[in-house]
């Protein structure tokens, strides 16, 4: 074989190797975001485990562990949406619907477990009214979860967004009596089919740094006060009250003043779940 032929053959092999390497690299690059997408969905699915262990703790009458699992579920729920948007999971893993996945988990961790918690730890009246009120909360929450207009375009919720996983631990740690607890639950449930605005703790741009700070302080306070039970903590109790008042206050402000940041009242499904 002539020198030119050898050179040509060598060049061909090098080109083929380069093309093969490029193809492998491109394939790996394509697989990489898919792997990230599956990781995000798996992280979201951890909320189901939090729900299972939380429900077991309620059944065992272990309120400290139950609140801990609810808190962990809240952290997962707060982070998975950010990760899903960052890694574009809808594009890279379209066979899994993150909205449906989160909706299923939220129904357990945000509604079922908190309602069972109230019944198990006698937070509601001991007579049949307790079961009736719990049933009303479940019914209204199921209807809210099915709303097609859960959120406005500026990311405020229409009606109370089933955040019973925040309300119930707060009322429990405040040692609220059964009937005041029942009245608070009824009032919140009654708003669920209205267009009264409630603040999304992560997505509303207006006051976002303050909102995130208030939410983190509330969560830390819940964990610290739960660990210290049955001791009372007046400062902690004041912080527990401040967070719901802030959320309700911003909701009242938004309801009265209308959309923020160029948003409008256009209804859309909630993005709290994706």
Feature locations, PLM:
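C-terminal membrane-associated helical module and adjoining short loops/tails
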Residues: 2-27, 157-274
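Hydrophobic alpha-helical transmembrane segments and immediately flanking/interface helices
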Residues: 35-36, 126-145, 199-206, 250-260
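Active-site-proximal cofactor/substrate-binding loop regions of enzyme domains
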Residues: 30-86
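Cytosolic, membrane-interface loops and tails of multi-pass inner-membrane proteins
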Residues: 20-31, 79-98, 155-158, 162, ...
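Helix-coil boundary and interhelical linker segments in multi-pass alpha-helical membrane proteins
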Residues: 53-68, 108, 114-133, 171-182, ...
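Multi-pass membrane catalytic core of lipid/isoprenoid biosynthesis enzymes
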Residues: 40-45, 86-144
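Lipid-exposed faces of alpha-helical membrane segments in multi-pass integral membrane proteins
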Residues: 43-49, 69-72, 76, 108-111, ...
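Short, amphipathic, aromatic/basic-enriched membrane-interface segments that mark the entry/exit
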Residues: 32-42, 96-104, 150-158, 201-208
């Amino acid at each position: 074989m002539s020198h030119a032929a050898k050179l040509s053959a060598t060049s061909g092999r090098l080109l083929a190797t380069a093309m093969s390497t490029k193809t492998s690299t491109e394939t790996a690059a394509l697989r990489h975001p898919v792997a990230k997408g599956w990781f995000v969905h798996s992280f979201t699915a951890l909320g189901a485990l939090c729900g299972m262990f939380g429900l077991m703790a309620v059944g065992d009458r272990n309120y400290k562990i139950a609140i801990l699992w609810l808190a962990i579920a809240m952290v997962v729920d707060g982070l998975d949406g950010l990760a899903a948007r960052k890694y574009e999971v809808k594009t890279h893993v379209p066979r899994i619907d993150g909205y449906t996945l989160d909706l299923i988990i939220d129904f357990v961790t945000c509604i079922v477990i908190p309602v069972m918690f109230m019944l198990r730890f006698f937070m509601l009246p001991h007579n049949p009214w307790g079961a009736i009120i719990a049933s009303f909360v479940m019914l209204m929450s199921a209807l809210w979860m099915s709303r097609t207009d859960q959120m406005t375009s500026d990311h405020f919720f229409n009606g109370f967004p089933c955040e019973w996983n925040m309300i119930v631990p707060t009322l429990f740690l405040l040692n609220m009596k059964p009937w005041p607890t029942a009245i608070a639950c009824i009032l919140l449930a009654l708003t669920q089919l209205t267009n009264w605005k409630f603040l999304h703790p992560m997505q509303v741009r207006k006051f976002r740094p303050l909102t995130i700070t208030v939410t983190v302080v509330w969560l830390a306070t819940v964990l610290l006060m739960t660990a210290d039970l049955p001791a009372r903590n007046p400062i902690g109790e004041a912080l527990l009250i401040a967070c719901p008042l802030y959320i309700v206050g911003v909701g009242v402000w938004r309801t009265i003043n209308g959309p923020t940041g160029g948003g409008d009242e256009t209804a859309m499904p909630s993005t709290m779940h994706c």
